[in-house]
């Protein structure tokens, strides 16, 4: 699917694509024009390849936030079957910023949980812009505990700017809900695979991201704070997001080098927003492969491996 939403650095490509479309519309049976269209299409692919091979960290932030990137429900449609959504935390309410339920991956029952954003204004408000309240994290934990009870592997999709910072969320125990999830996920005895699909925003992301394997899509980001938030704190200037992005080391290659993640999942040329099906196919292969490896481990190996994985992240160099 070709997105109509343009990123600034993609404009030369979009302009050429418009010219190609105009040529194609008038080409008819004209062989010369058809040949020219084919040449220009190859040129577009080459331009996009060069652009995306040289993205700055700030440009990757923009791609990760692209409104047409696939969200959790899109992956559920393309990768899983027999999805049954489960609602509510049994304490306060149902948070629409987190979706989850039972599904099948290649015929095997799994529990799928993920952040869910919206695309139009109505849906964005309904999903609270992908920022969960405490009841969202408590719903996620309820489903994880259910998965453990029924011995179902857990797969989570992370894509959030962060946990919702509203007064109501704080009154209902936002910090406690996140902290409890971190503690409980670390001790679960079933395989957990985490996928960072877009924005991995601080504790709001980590609350469903303690896993045996952590995968990141090629142009996703994962950090302790947004670049704009970091810039506002360090330099009292939120417009210095590009500078902060460089300092945060928030891209998939950065985090693979630091051993924070286990694998970078290749995106289609131009990003996941351009081709949901190919992105889902690539991710499906990675999920199936990692799940097979994790199922071969004993419970003791799973829990100890997960513990050691997160313990070694606190390295620093002088």
UniProtKB/Swiss-Prot annotation:
GO cellular component: acetyl-CoA carboxylase complex
Similarity-based family: Belongs to the AccA family.
Subunit note: Acetyl-CoA carboxylase is a heterohexamer composed of biotin carboxyl carrier protein (AccB), biotin carboxylase (AccC) and two subunits each of ACCase subunit alpha (AccA) and ACCase subunit beta (AccD).
GO biological-process terms attached to the record: fatty acid biosynthetic process; malonyl-CoA biosynthetic process
Localization of this protein: Cytoplasm
Known function: Component of the acetyl coenzyme A carboxylase (ACC) complex. First, biotin carboxylase catalyzes the carboxylation of biotin on its carrier protein (BCCP) and then the CO(2) group is transferred by the carboxyltransferase to acetyl-CoA to form malonyl-CoA.
E.C. number(s) listed in UniProt: 2.1.3.15
Keywords associated with the record: ATP-binding, Cytoplasm, Fatty acid biosynthesis, Fatty acid metabolism, Lipid biosynthesis, Lipid metabolism, Nucleotide-binding, Transferase
Main location: cytoplasm
Domain CoA carboxyltransferase C-terminal: 39-293
Catalytic activity of the protein: N(6)-carboxybiotinyl-L-lysyl-[protein] + acetyl-CoA = N(6)-biotinyl-L-lysyl-[protein] + malonyl-CoA
Statement: the UniProt record of this protein carries the keyword Nucleotide-binding: yes
Protein name as it appears in the record: Acetyl-coenzyme A carboxylase carboxyl transferase subunit alpha
PROSITE patterns: COA_CT_CTER
One GO MF term attached to the UniProt entry: acetyl-CoA carboxylase activity
Pfam families: ACCA
Pathway: Lipid metabolism; malonyl-CoA biosynthesis; malonyl-CoA from acetyl-CoA: step 1/1
InterPro entries: Acetyl_CoA_COase_a_su, ClpP/crotonase-like_dom_sf, COA_CT_C
């Amino acid at each position: 699917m070709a997105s109509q939403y343009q990123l600034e650095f993609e404009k030369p490509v979009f302009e050429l694509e418009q010219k190609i479309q105009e040529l194609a519309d008038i080409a008819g049976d004209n062989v010369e024009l058809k040949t020219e269209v084919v040449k220009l299409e190859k040129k577009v692919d080459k331009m996009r390849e060069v652009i995306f091979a040289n993205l700055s960290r700030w440009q990757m932030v923009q791609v990760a936030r692209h409104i047409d990137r696939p969200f959790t429900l899109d992956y559920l449609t393309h990768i899983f079957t027999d999805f049954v959504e489960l609602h509510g935390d049994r304490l306060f309410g149902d948070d629409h910023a987190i979706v989850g339920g039972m599904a099948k991956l290649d015929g095997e029952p799994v529990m799928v949980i993920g952040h869910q954003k919206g695309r139009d204004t109505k849906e964005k408000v309904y999903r609270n812009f992908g920022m969960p309240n405490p009841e969202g994290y408590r719903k996620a934990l309820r489903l994880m505990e259910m998965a453990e009870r029924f011995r179902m592997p857990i797969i989570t999709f992370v894509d959030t700017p962060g946990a919702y910072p509203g007064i109501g969320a704080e009154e209902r125990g936002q910090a406690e809900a996140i902290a409890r999830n971190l503690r409980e996920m670390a001790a679960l005895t079933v395989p957990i695979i985490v996928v960072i699909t877009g924005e991995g925003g601080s504790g709001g992301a980590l609350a469903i991201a303690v896993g045996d394997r952590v995968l990141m899509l090629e142009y996703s980001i994962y950090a302790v704070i947004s670049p704009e938030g970091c810039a506002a704190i360090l330099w009292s200037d939120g417009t210095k997001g590009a500078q902060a992005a460089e300092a945060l080391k928030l891209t998939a290659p950065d985090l693979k080098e630091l051993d924070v993640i286990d694998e970078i999942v290749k995106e289609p040329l131009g990003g996941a927003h351009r081709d949901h099906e190919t992105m889902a196919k690539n991710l499906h292969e990675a999920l199936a492969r990692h799940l097979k490896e994790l199922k071969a481990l004993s419970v003791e190996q799973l829990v100890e491996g997960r513990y050691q994985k997160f313990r070694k992240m606190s390295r620093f160099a002088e």
